Amino acid sequence: MESLTLQPIVHIEGTINLPGSKSVSNRALLLAALAKGKTRLTNLLDSDDIRHMLNALTALGVQYQLSNNNTVCDIEGLAGSFHPQQPLELFLGNAGTAMRPLAAALSLGEHDIVLTGEPRMKERPIGHLVDALRQGGAKIDYLEQTDYPPLRVCGGFSGGSVDVDGTVSSQFLTALLMMAPLAQQDTTITIKGELVSKPYIDITLALINTFGGEIENQNYQRFMIKGGQQYQSPGKYLVEGDASSASYFLAAAAIKGGIVRVTGIGKNSLQGDIHFASVLEKMGATIRWGDDYIECERGKLKGIDMDMNTIPDAAMTIATTALFAEGETTIRNIYNWRVKETDRLSAMATELRKVGAMVDEGRDYLTVIPPKQLTTAEIKTYNDHRIAMCFSLVALSNTPITILDPGCTAKTFPDYFEKLASISHAKV
């Protein structure tokens, strides 16, 4: 297996232009494909998850042109739902942001499509979404294990009243919201339980609005959607920078800055993960907000105890930042870490212990007590891009750290380690 050893970094300073947001990129691609007219998407993320969506759209008859660096995409919209002429099998890797929305979008019309992916994708639950789609008339079969991909989707969704469990993943609701305006009849979606990762629903609603869709949001408990709508291309759409990816550079500044500025996101961004910066501020870092940047400067960091349900991806970065804080840090209400690219709660606890931390792993929380001195270790990354990036921060101590399978960052941030090196000053 490939590995990358990061030598101790003594100082961090500089500016990072962020790659496009994964969450925004895949939503925008799907909506542009379903819309009437041609859409130019700029600052599109160039990564594995986006390629899986693009490959699926090609198979489904969508025509598009990508720029040489894969960050500008001109898409000819279909002016409605997908109508593939023959049975298809779509391989979606481990891209939840492709699997869930496509399962919903393909529930419209009549066809025979199999959605499958990597072994880990077959362990990521999708039953709550399938249950909701079936309530609206969709014909969907599980091909292996009940409640998990691969799926056979044969269309049939027409609308009506559906309820969806909100406690596991906001992507199920996102998938329903993007598809429902194109259904023949009106749809009412009722949320069961507490809706997790609510800021991701705000991203979805903002994008639907940009493409001319109308949804009535009744306090995130019920959503009323008129059927028979048509998405309209906005012409051009700029994908903002990935706020989850910003977290590593902002945390690095909080630990060993110097001032680091990340550009492509700012105080008015769609993404909830910008509030990671506010968590760093609570820990003791200095944060400055601009319209299209966030700056962080080192401070004396103290441990915190916080509910981080609204920033689940960026909250992982707090777990490794906690290694450099005074006192213990507890990250609460993060059960949905367990259904991501890997069981992130278990994986983070295991790897944090390797570098010397004392860790209490609960069902839905993680407590980290930093050691006096971090120990060098080989970090297993579980084919999870965020674990690889989180543990790169250990190099901000006086201890080298080895990251196994560093290429797994290709899921969202292929050149992450090069970007980190560009603002790092190592021991000579």
From Swiss-Prot:
Catalyzes the transfer of the enolpyruvyl moiety of phosphoenolpyruvate (PEP) to the 5-hydroxyl of shikimate-3-phosphate (S3P) to produce enolpyruvyl shikimate-3-phosphate and inorganic phosphate. The gene is aroA. It catalyses: 3-phosphoshikimate + phosphoenolpyruvate = 5-O-(1-carboxyvinyl)-3-phosphoshikimate + phosphate. Belongs to the EPSP synthase family. It is an enzyme of class 2 (transferase). Phosphoenolpyruvate binds at residues 22, 96, 124, 171, 344, 386, 411. Keywords: Amino-acid biosynthesis, Aromatic amino acid biosynthesis, Cytoplasm, Transferase. It is found in: Cytoplasm. Monomer. It holds the Pfam family EPSP_synthase. It comes from the Bacteria. GO terms for molecular function: 3-phosphoshikimate 1-carboxyvinyltransferase activity. 3-phosphoshikimate binds at residues 22-23, 27, 169-171, 197, 313, 336, 340. NCBIfam families: aroA. This is 3-phosphoshikimate 1-carboxyvinyltransferase. One of its GO terms (biological process) is aromatic amino acid family biosynthetic process. Gene3D superfamilies: Enolpyruvate transferase domain. Its EC number is 2.5.1.19. PROSITE patterns: EPSP_SYNTHASE_1, EPSP_SYNTHASE_2.
